Every structure is written in C-alpha cells, then in structure tokens.
Amino acid sequence: MDKQQDQQQEARPVLEGPDIARVLTRIAHEIVERAKGADDVVLLGIPTRGVFLARRLADKLEQITERKMPVGSLDITMYRDDLRMHPPRALARTEIPGDGIDGRLVVLVDDVLFSGRTIRAALDALNDIGRPRAVQLAVLVDRGHRELPIRADYVGKNLPTSLRETVKVQLAEEDGRDTVLLGAKPAAPGAHP
C-alpha cells in the first residue's frame, strides 16, 4: 500500500454527498435572503473545486429564484504570494459572465478557507477585472488558522482543525465522489512519531 492510500485510510469523512447538497441549499437560501432576491448576484468559483461548487450553487439559486444565475471562474494563479516558493501551476481559465461584474454583487466560491491567502489573491484578481458593488465569500469548509483578516460570509461547515491535520474536498466532477475528509498530515521524512 502506498503512502497516499495509507493517508486516505486514516482520513475520516466529515461531510458526504447528501451533507454537501444540504449545505449548498442552505447557502443558496442565505444568499437570496441577504441579497434580497439575488437579482444582481454573480458567482465566481476559484479553480478547481470552487468552480464546481459555484456551478452547483448557481443551480440551487436558479431553483429558488426561478432565474438563470451568472456563474464563472476566477483564476488567481498569477496573483498568489507564493509563486517564488513553489513552481508555477498551470493557468486555469478566468471566465466572467457576459454582463460583467461592475456594480454587481460578486460571491466568490471556494472549497476550503484556511489562511486567507487564496482569497486575498482572488480580491486582487477581481480588482483588475472590474468594480463590483460588493464582494462576498462562500466556502464549503472553514478550517480556521487565518493569516489575514478575511472571513467567509457563507460557510457550509466550520471545522476547527490543528495545523497537523489536512482537509481534502472531493467532488464528483473532479474526483468521482462527493466527500470532505479530515486526516493527519504525513510525517516529515526522518521524523519519528
């Protein structure tokens, strides 16, 4: 058995498919309530899993409001503050809905909120694209450990973790199943348990 399989066995599910569907439905209702109808809402997912979550959220919002929700994606690769430390990833696509974001309520959608650095990069990228009326954040999981003063407006599950734990979101579109796994980080090479 390889290390990744061993790690998968140690991880325990904290959300499964029906739970994820339920929290997305709740978040959709919260968006409609807070936006007073969601007429000017634009959803932008942060690749990769944030894009899938944004599309699912758009479907839920369409069921509630009976109108098509603009949904797109926001690539933050070139806005990351760790480009010097890690090799660059492949660029994802930024897709802004036809009506743009100027004067609209943009809801950024991501899978896990951790340090806040991804969202800071997303705000920088958004600033280069246009001037929304307001920006809100929806996340499937908030695991804490913020390094920047950023908080989510809509949270599927607050999951306090230690820095020695990992949170892995798996979605059917990318991974073949819907689950959120909480596991232990692998020990550093040469470290003793």
From Swiss-Prot:
NCBIfam families, alphabetized: PRK05205.1-3, PRK05205.1-5
Binding-site list for substrate: 48-49, 89, 93, 110-118, 143, 167
Descriptive protein name: Bifunctional protein PyrR
EC number: 2.4.2.9
Summary of the function given for this chain in its UniProt record: Regulates the transcription of the pyrimidine nucleotide (pyr) operon in response to exogenous pyrimidines. Also displays a weak uracil phosphoribosyltransferase activity which is not physiologically significant.
CDD domains registered for this protein in UniProt: PRTases_typeI (cd06223)
Catalytic activity: UMP + diphosphate = 5-phospho-alpha-D-ribose 1-diphosphate + uracil
Keyword Zinc-finger set for record: no
EC class: transferase
Motif (PRPP-binding): 106-118
Single GO MF annotation: uracil phosphoribosyltransferase activity
Transferase among keywords: yes
